[in-house]
Amino acid sequence: IKEILERVKYESSIYVTLTTLKYLKKGGRITPAAAALGTLLRIKPVLTIQGEKLDAFSKARTAKQARSIMLTALAKDLDERFHDKNAEHTYLEIAHTCNEEDAKELEAALKEQYPGADITTAPLSLSIACHIGPGSLAVACSGKLKELE
């Protein structure tokens, strides 16, 4: 099992959007000035995690625009990284922090776009949620293990 996990640990893409920059500031991930400016401009950041690295991916002005950015990025990853345009050999995951309504909307959009895909929706773990705050929404894709199919 350890060999399989070591081999596939970088074979996933995760996109996260936040409703507030407060928790990134508290955790020291952004400066107080960046948090104040982002809050003033009502920026909804879209972050990406690929492997062990968390990076800024894009900025949106509305939650709807942030979700659209995440779905577009996910579609690109499915096509180019996973070579699975229809998500038939890929798991799709949605996670949220106290944002079940938006998570269900995102799940409906994914089901419409990828009718045969395995889609899971769940709350984010507390170990992550405490760093990004309530209202956050994430979408992820990861390749299915051939050993389990």
In which residue ranges do the predicted regions lie?
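Mixed-charge interfacial surface used for oligomerization/domain docking
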Residues: 1-149
